[in-house]
Amino acid sequence: MAYPMQLGFQDATSPIMEELLHFHDHTLMIVFLISSLVLYIISLMLTTKLTHTSTMDAQEVETIWTILPAIILIMIALPSLRILYMMDEINNPSLTVKTMGHQWYWSYEYTDYEDLSFDSYMIPTSELKPGELRLLEVDNRVVLPMEMTVRMLISSEDVLPSWAVPSLGLKTDAIPGRLNQTTLMSTRPGLFYGQCSEICGSNHSFMPIVLELVPLKYFEKWSASML
């Protein structure tokens, strides 16, 4: 999860987020190299007194600055498209959870179980226990098995929120009348916090998301206790 004065991303806990972090570093290196080259050329232009007053065109230079940007764009586009297809790919999910956005809370339904559903409200600041996080804790956490593919079906009843958990690389809009889907898989257990990431109304800031990823045997015990 995030911590005060954090400068980078949250620690990745899913294969998709790992890929996104690698892509970010890859793109940032390209931006750094281009910026360094531009600054170097500007410094040369400001410091040198040599000019080519008789030069009308330079086909070699024009060819280079046409081909080089195209190569750079391809180097950015190919890994980006690969990650986009990975995020859309859903292969035999082990569990399906339906998420509905409301004013101003989330409700969850485990569709593989006959009667396992609940609402998840933010815990008010006045009711927080020592060590709990302001504006991030909920009364009912979403418990999921780790190291298993989970499909999330996301929609809304009224407003237009967005269901997002940064450390898992998830952000999916919840739209009334439309069912969006995404997948998640955690490589380690823990609590993972998210929030509504679309300004959906007056209490947009009070729609936190808490996922509790646990080993399968603990998930089975939890699901049995909830039925």
From Swiss-Prot:
The keyword Metal-binding applies. Keywords: Copper, Electron transport, Magnesium, Membrane, Metal-binding, Mitochondrion, Mitochondrion inner membrane, Phosphoprotein, Respiratory chain, Translocase, Transmembrane, Transmembrane helix, Transport. The lineage of its organism: Eukaryota, Metazoa, Chordata, Craniata, Vertebrata. It comes from Ovis aries. This is Cytochrome c oxidase subunit 2. Residues 46-59 are mitochondrial matrix. Residues 1-14, 88-227 are mitochondrial intermembrane. Cu cation A1 binds at residues 196, 200, 207. The modification Phosphotyrosine is found at residue 218. It is an enzyme of class 7 (translocase).
